[in-house]
Amino acid sequence: MGVSLVTENGRVFGAGLALNEEEIYYIPVEGMITEGYLCGKLEELLHKVSESNTENIMKSNTDDVKKDPENEISDVNTDGTLKYDKKCVCALDVKALLKHIKSDDPMAVFDAGVAAYLLNPLKSSYTYDDMAKEYLNGRILPAREELLGKKTVEKAWEESAEGLAAWACYMAYTALACRKPMCEALCDTGMWNVYTQIELPLIFTLDSMEKWGISVKSEELKSYGEKLSVRIGELEKQIWQQAGEEFNINSPKQMGVILFEKLGLKGGKKTKTGYSTAADILEKLAPEYPIVKDILEYRQLTKLKSTYADGLANVIAEDGRIHSTFNQTITATGRISSTEPNLQNIPIRMELGRLIRKVFVPEEGYVFLDADYSQIELRVLAH
């Protein structure tokens, strides 16, 4: 069965269900169908799939299947073809489902998005219409933009109910229909074990990490923001004093006029919109001109304040933790990335930047472990 859950900002609007490639339905959350009821029924479905697969494995005659040293029962027949009697729920993004539906069985699901990523990790996005074109014999399906335009899900729910239903159904259909060709492609490219043994279980691990979150000392974060505000105010006055007038330091156009016309700094590059005040230009001038050094520090601190001090404070949940999103299908190298917020690029070079890391704390009785493979890609290639 193919499943798509239509969600936005934690709210569930409906679900697309593809029983097969001909029977596809949309169930909106309305009337007696509440979010809890719909998600509960989908959770029951996943549980039944898990139970069914467990029973089949127990009854399976191991002489009829090809043994895999890493698994008790293989998904491959003795002739090398894939078995499709194993039931599963197919989705474009299983982790998105797990935010609303509980399950701990990787073998009960098929994630078309992760499969598409393994087959072509260089793509920037994996949409259902792209998958259909590539894995369903060039089939053309209307893209999200064609069905909903630029509307949010909530806006589409209010104004384009038919388009929203079609979108949900196309996603469910694509996830189901792509299962066989994608699995065959994973086998052909030698990626089947990577998918089943690494990427599929990782979905559930990342989901658990997101739900658990990381503890933050909110008061220290607030204090950090106040320290930044004080220093930013000091720099602002210093810059205005050196410039001889007040101006908008965040305006490249105004800054360019001040630096390269009024103060006559050398090295200015004029464009159609004014002088360039890009970091690489200013960094060359900083050793000679104190005002430029102050401007660079001002930029760094205002970014720290908006992105980290204020930005992180705004995403602390009621449980006092930050629940980031971890992505496994974005980087071409397979590295996990973090968004909403990004916890992987918190600065460490500046003293004020290092302070931000101290607001993250482990659970009582635990410590943070910092582990890294040194130059792992080069070492693997050399091996």
Annotate the PLM regions.
Residues M1-E134, S229, A382:
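Conserved RNase H-like, two-metal-ion catalytic cores of nucleic-acid enzymes
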Residues M1-M32, G80-C88, L92, L147-R354, ...:
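Conserved "right-hand" nucleotidyltransferase catalytic core of DNA-directed polymerases
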Residues A112-Y173:
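Short alpha-helix plus adjacent loop in nuclease-associated cores
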Residues M107-A108, R349, V359-P362, H383:
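Short, surface-exposed loop/turn microsegments at beta-strand edges and helix-strand junctions
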Residues D105, R139-I140, F247, G267:
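Secondary-structure boundary/capping signal
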Residues L42-E43, R357-V359:
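A generic local secondary-structure boundary/capping motif
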